[in-house]
From Swiss-Prot:
NCBIfam families cross-referenced by the UniProt entry: ispG_gcpE, PRK00366.1
Pfam families the record matches: GcpE (PF04551)
Protein name per its UniProtKB record: 4-hydroxy-3-methylbut-2-en-1-yl diphosphate synthase (flavodoxin)
Keyword Cell membrane: no
Enzyme Commission number, as recorded: 1.17.7.3
Role according to the record: Converts 2C-methyl-D-erythritol 2,4-cyclodiphosphate (ME-2,4cPP) into 1-hydroxy-2-methyl-2-(E)-butenyl 4-diphosphate.
A Gene Ontology molecular function term of the record: iron ion binding
Keywords: 4Fe-4S, Iron, Iron-sulfur, Isoprene biosynthesis, Metal-binding, Oxidoreductase
Length: 369
């Protein structure tokens, strides 16, 4: 039953992506990106709905050409979550999705082209109240910066970002956020640190092309964890070569670990050893699968023996300590004993009961103001 995060977040300007605030005092928003063919409207809508069910706040959709832009408009009509259009090279695509109701434009001004084209995109965004994300990536730095620095560096990423920020400043446009992504953790972290000191706009965090589910999760947790612990970051996207739903889960797990957001169950579980009185790994796998639908923030401890079990269980909303018999704690107090027979079924029932009670109590507290 952990309290508020001790992290003091960097002060930033608040913008709105659809109905989701980003920056300022807003919760750190969790994003993901579809990996379907955007022209396959049904498949893309279905994937977006799965992301919504997982708790995503904002979804980015790649729009590589005009056909995809028209498909984007149809997708937008069928979903409620804010959509970001990912635009490269052709500024006319950005103009079209702006007409079709996009909630945010992700552009790399370095590959959009001449200043008049960037101005056209900015004017369209301003007229419709659409924010822009300046997306700088180590893999697509401007040629002059590549020549100047010889290779991608934190300073090169920041110089590119500030170049585009100054461009928007000249156009008197402030409704934007910025990312400076790299696949190298240290490069990305240092770039964000440098940029955070120089602008007030919200920062979109990510380790780009981080890798597969396991390696990408580790890289993202390390890199984003370092930044978030320093108060840097207003929205996050975990880039994984995996099901996009996993990006949302990992994003929330990172935020939960830092007490920056709470959604669903925060499991505390031992790695298990020969002292365990029940199969901890099997129990955890079953519980995680069964309880994915719960959205109420809840700490659940699953500890296999009495060495650390009672201490961890007393700190959780629901805790299980292995023993003969096993002992359940509710809100830090011993509640009932359980044998290994139907252990997961009984534990699931108790967790759901506690979640319902907490949801009711939280609702009453909100109603009282």
């Amino acid at each position: 039953m952990h309290g508020e995060s001790p992290i003091k977040r960097r002060e930033s300007r608040k913008i709105w992506v659809g109905n989701v605030p980003v920056g300022g005092d807003a919760p750190i928003a969790v994003q993901s990106m579809t990996n379907t063919d955007t022209n396959d409207v049904a498949a893309t809508v279905a994937q977006i709905q799965r992301l919504v069910d997982a708790g995503v706040d904002i979804v980015r959709v790649s729009v590589p050409d005009m056909d995809a832009a028209e498909a984007f408009g149809k997708i937008k009509q069928r979903v409620s979550v804010p959509l970001v259009a990912d635009i490269h090279f052709d500024y006319k695509i950005a103009l079209r999705v702006a007409e079709l109701g996009v909630d945010c434009l992700r552009i790399n001004p370095g590959n959009i082209g001449r200043e008049d084209r960037v101005r056209a995109v900015v004017d369209a965004a301003r007229d419709r109240g659409i924010p822009i994300r300046i997306g700088v990536n180590a893999g697509s730095l401007e040629k002059d910066l590549q020549k100047k620095y010889g290779e991608p560096t934190p300073a090169a990423l920041v110089e590119s970002a500030l170049r585009h920020v100054e461009h928007l400043d000249r156009l008197d446009f402030q409704d934007f956020k910025v990312s400076v992504k790299a696949s190298d953790v240290f490069m990305a972290v240092e770039a964000y640190r440098l940029l955070a000191k120089q602008i007030v706009q919200p920062l979109h965090l990510g380790i780009t092309e981080a890798g597969g589910l396991r390696s990408g999760t580790v890289k993202s947790a390390v890199g984003l964890g370092m930044l978030l612990a320093e108060g840097i970051g207003d929205t996050i996207r975990i880039s994984l070569a995996a099901d996009p739903v996993e990006e949302v889960k990992v994003g929330y797990d990172i935020l939960k670990s830092l007490h920056l957001r709470s959604r669903g169950i925060n499991f505390i579980a031992c790695p298990s050893c020969s002292r365990q009185n029940f199969d901890v790994v099997k129990t955890m796998n079953e519980l995680e699968g069964r309880l994915e639908d719960l959205l109420v923030p809840l700490d659940v401890a699953v500890i296999g023996c009495v060495v650390n079990g009672p201490g961890e269980a007393k700190e959780a909303h629901v805790g299980l300590t292995g023993g003969t018999p096993n002992l359940i704690y509710i809100d830090g107090k011993p509640a009932q004993k359980l044998t290994n027979d139907n252990l997961v079924d009984e534990l699931e029932k108790l967790i759901r009961q506690k979640a319902a009670e907490k949801a009711e109590a939280d609702a009453a507290l909100i109603a009282r103001g």
